[in-house]
């Protein structure tokens, strides 16, 4: 860094040069304040009743050696977790959720425990036709409809993701005049009129797109969850998050964007302190915690536990964590208590 550069020069949406210098200090680990005295068991025990509404696994069309969805579901059951909702970038996960649930029921009886509830959904990438109302209707019918809980807007094929990665244009939910495309309105209408409650996640959209989506979702009475608002690609400022909360959206903060993924994305600079700031300034009432794990080397139940443990040791109360891991995702997904 050249001399005279302002400490407040941004190296990300909110991260400054000063922030980077602090965490790059050679004595950084030895200068941190003492942790609150919570053990790993304290964090693990808090998984009981928790919901992880955004996680990944195998089988998948992208990234080898992801954790098995079935094995993750077993680990969640052993921890007493209430529900999981698996996401894949390429295919509808609701049918797989049904198959996993049936297998899990038999296994849980043998173990003498209660199985976690397993759900899925669909992500509107090119593999399912993009912003495709037919894919949404398919998710909501048939003998796997009850396992559909989340509809994700485009992720790896979104305009934001593709342009950020230097891959050219991608899918946008806005037309050339900056208004929501008709097919997006149709999709929200399908969701709002369905017998099965489904939450919509913003996924990898520009903030401008999310704001327009939130306005329309509110009109239709559709539950909107703003996906990994602590990840640099889709990061929200405190002010943006407040604006979306005012439109009745939930703000999702995820473990991998707080803690990093050393195998799948070594060296990834994450927004740990911005995650803490969002929790502190917004409060827990409209925040949902999730793992977003399931990448190579990132087991979802383990990552969720580590996120909880980290928050406990940094002063976030058990009551606030329970709100963000149990009560809020239950409300967003309309799960029975």
Residue ranges of predicted features:
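Histidine/acidic-residue-rich catalytic or RNA/ligand-binding cores of hydrolases
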Residues: 61-66, 94-98, 210-216, 235-241, ...
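Divalent metal-dependent hydrolysis catalytic cores, especially in the metallo-beta-lactamase
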Residues: 52, 71-95, 114-127, 148-158, ...
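Active-site mouth loops of central-metabolism enzymes
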Residues: 50-68, 120-130, 172-178
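Mid-to-C-terminal alpha-helical segments outside catalytic/metal-binding sites
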Residues: 302-337
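Extended substrate/RNA-proximal surfaces in nucleic-acid metabolism proteins
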Residues: 125-227
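An N-terminally biased module of ancient metal coordination in phosphate/nucleic-acid-related enzymes
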Residues: 2-116
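Catalytic pocket-lining loop regions of alpha/beta-barrel enzymes
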Residues: 202-270
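Short acidic/histidine-rich active-site segments
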Residues: 254, 284-301
């Amino acid at each position: 860094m050249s001399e005279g550069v302002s400490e407040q020069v941004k190296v990300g949406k909110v991260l400054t040069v000063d922030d980077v210098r602090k965490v790059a200090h050679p004595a950084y680990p030895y200068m941190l304040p003492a942790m609150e005295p919570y053990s790993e068991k304290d964090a693990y025990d808090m998984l009981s009743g928790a919901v992880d509404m955004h996680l990944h696994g195998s089988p998948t069309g992208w990234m080898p050696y992801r954790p098995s969805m079935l094995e993750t579901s077993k680990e969640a059951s052993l921890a007493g977790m209430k529900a999981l909702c698996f996401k894949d970038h390429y295919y509808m996960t609701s049918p797989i959720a049904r198959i996993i649930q049936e297998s899990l029921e038999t296994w849980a009886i043998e173990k003498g425990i209660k199985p976690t509830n397993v759900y899925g959904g669909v992500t509107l990438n090119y593999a399912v036709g993009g912003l495709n109302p037919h894919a949404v209707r398919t998710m909501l019918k048939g003998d796997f409809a009850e396992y559909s809980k989340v509809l994700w807007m485009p992720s790896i094929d979104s305009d934001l993701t593709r342009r950020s990665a230097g891959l050219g244009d991608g899918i946008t939910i806005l037309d050339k005049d900056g208004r929501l495309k008709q097919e997006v309105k149709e999709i929200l209408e399908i969701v709002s009129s369905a017998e099965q409650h489904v939450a919509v996640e913003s996924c990898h959209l520009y903030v401008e797109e999310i704001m327009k989506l939130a306005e329309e979702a509110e009109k239709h009475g559709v539950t909107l969850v703003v996906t990994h608002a602590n990840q640099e690609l889709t990061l929200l400022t405190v002010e943006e998050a407040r604006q979306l909360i005012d439109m009745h959206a939930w703000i999702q903060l995820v473990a991998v964007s707080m803690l990093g993924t050393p195998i799948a994305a070594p060296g990834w600079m994450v927004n740990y302190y911005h995650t803490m700031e969002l929790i502190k300034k917004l409060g827990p009432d409209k925040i949902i915690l999730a793992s977003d794990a399931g990448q190579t080397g990132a087991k979802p139940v383990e990552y969720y536990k580590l996120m909880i443990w980290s928050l406990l040791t940094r002063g976030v109360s058990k009551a606030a964590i329970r709100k963000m891991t149990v009560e809020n995702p239950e409300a967003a997904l309309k799960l029975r208590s």
